[in-house]
Amino acid sequence: MIVRPQQHWLRRIFVWHGSVLSKISSRLLLNFLFSIAVIFMLPWYTHLGIKFTLAPFSILGVAIAIFLGFRNNAGYARYVEARKLWGQLMIASRSLLREVKTTLPDSASVREFARLQIAFAHCLRMTLRKQPQAEVLAHYLKTEDLQRVLASNSPANRILLIMGEWLAVQRRNGQLSDILFISLNDRLNDISAVLAGCERIAYTPIPFAYTLILHRTVYLFCIMLPFALVVDLHYMTPFISVLISYTFISLDCLAEELEDPFGTENNDLPLDAICNAIEIDLLQMNDEAEIPAKILPDRHYQLT
């Protein structure tokens, strides 16, 4: 995620980091070079009686813009829902530990439970990003718990099970009444709902056929556009063609990024920073001495 301060409008025009321009610059360069080639081809295809006009491109351009808008809205809706889910995880994690600490006597067991919560957040992050988990989770889980988690097809869900088992032990030992156990178990259900919601977004992409047809149409439009522009614009064709192509190609590229909000690209959610915030909050609630430093944006204003 790019977290930039407010900028002057003129300075913002030339921003590079965080813009999709860095990803599509090579495609725009090809469009520029192809437009130059079309200028030299103009006498040849005019001699053959081939004539392109802007009218069909105007109609097609409007249609593409509408469908790109729909796709970007769908991608942004996934992005917003994903952020809400992680916000719910932060709320549920704080509330669960607060209720445990105010109900049970402060002990090493309660601190262990807090580490299970931290492990869950990191495990969910790494699962969504398809990253290796063993090294990170080893800092928070006991050896036997770590082995159970890594052997599971759903590591985050296994950690939830271990948390549920911990609550059950406290209940059997008489530390929790039935009412308190049900209340705390409801918090675990809230966290489980977050897990299911994130999995729904991660494993249900926007239909491929819809993405493919829009992607093809955008690039065919950008390839054919110089033939229609060159008749009236001549040597200005490359510049106008690149400007129009930038609009369509950048929207297509941005939609691809928003479709998977859990990745590590510029416009994805800062899951590292969110997990870091959860860890800091839970450790401070337990009055731990060693607290990790807060993750801040880098020099390019990016949070991962």
Swiss-Prot record:
Record-annotated membrane-spanning stretches: 28-48, 50-70, 194-214, 220-240
Membrane topology, record value: Multi-pass membrane protein
A biological process term (GO) from this entry: bacterial-type flagellum-dependent swarming motility
Pfam family, one: Bestrophin
Cellular component GO terms, alphabetical: plasma membrane
Record carries keyword rRNA-binding: no
UniProt keyword annotation of Transcription present: no
GO MF entry, a single one: chloride channel activity
Location within or outside the cell: Cell membrane
Keywords: Cell membrane, Ion transport, Membrane, Transmembrane, Transmembrane helix, Transport
Family: Belongs to the anion channel-forming bestrophin (TC 1.A.46) family.
Protein name per UniProt: Voltage-dependent anion channel-forming protein YneE
Gene that specifies this protein: yneE
